[in-house]
Amino acid sequence: MIGNNKKMTIQEIIHGPKVTSMKEAMSRGEWHSGCSWCKRLEETTGTSGRTVRYASPETLAAIDADMNFFKLEHLVVNWSNLCNLTCVYCNDQTSTAWQSVKKIPINYVKNEHEDLIELARTQGHNIQGLSLGGGEPLLQKGLDVFLSHLNPATVSVMVTTNLSMEITTNPIYQILKTWPTVEWMVSFDNANKEKFEYVRDRAIWEQFVKNIRQMKQDGQQVNAHPAYSIYCALDLEEYYDFCVSENLGIYWCELNHPMELDIRRHSQTLRDLAVEEINRVIDKYGDRRSLAIDVLKTYRNTLQDNSYLKYQENFKSSETLAWHIEIENTLKKTNKFVELWPTLAKEIQ
C-alpha cells in the first residue's frame, strides 16, 4: 500500500515517500516490491497494466528531465466494494453481498470520492486512459459526477463488470455507451448456465447473455475477461465457442487465490487434461485475432512446468472438495461442485 486516502489526501500520497521510492527504482531499471503484481503478470502472461498503457513522448521526456514531474494520463479507480454478487472465489472484503451473507454489518470500502472528483476536476483534461473496477462499477453512486469532469473525446475507458444487472436502465452504462472509446471487460468463467450461476452466485445466465447482446447492438467493444482456474480449464473449447459465436474478444486474468482453484497446483493428470484442452482451442482458433491465443500458450507452459509456483509444499489438492462444501453450505447452493465438474472431483478426492 502506498498510502491510505482516508488519512492522507491523494496529493500527499502522490508526492509521498513510497511513491518516490518506486520512481527511484524505476529510474534504475529495477522492479520495486510494490510492482510485484505487474512483474508476475508479465512473467506468466507476457502483459500487464504497465505494458498496455501508452505514455506520450512529451510525458516521457518530462519524466526523464524531472523524476517528480506529475501529469495524470492514466487512472485506475476501484470506486468501492459495493457488489451485487457472491462469486465463490470472492470474499467479504471485496463484496458487500458477501458481507450480507455472512451477516457482517455492511462496510463500504471506498475511495474518498470528493478527493477523487477534485482530482478529476483539476487533471481530467489530461486523462487519456481510465480503468473502472469495483466492487461493481455499474452500481457505484457518484461515479457519474466523476465522469462529468472528463472529456469523452480524448479518454479511452476500460470497465470491468460482472454484467449481471439490467443495463437498459443503468445510468452509468447509459452514459458510457455514448462515449467513443469504451472497452468492456466482462467477468465470467463459464459458458454453461449451471456452471456460470454456480461461480457467479446470484447472477442469472439469461440476463447476462441478454446484456451482452444489448451491448453488441449498441455498438460496444466487448471482451470476455475470464480468470484461468479449475472452473474453466477443462471447458475451454466450450468457452471459446461461445465467445466466438457472440463476437467477443478474450482477455485473460490471473487467479492465484484461493490456491485450491489454481489448476496449475493440481495433479499431473489434471494438468495434462488442461493442456489437451488448450491444444484443442489452439487447433480450432489459433488463426483468430483477439482471442488471446498467445496467453493460452503461456498457460500451457506453466501447466507443463509449474516449478515457478510458491508455497506449493503447503498445497493439498484434497482440501479442494472441503473448500467447496463450505462455500455451498454458506451460499445454500443446490448445484454441487462434484456434480458440475465430475472429472475434477474424481481426481482430487
Which positions does each model-derived feature cover?
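Alpha-helix boundary recognition
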Residues: 14-15, 27, 121, 177, ...
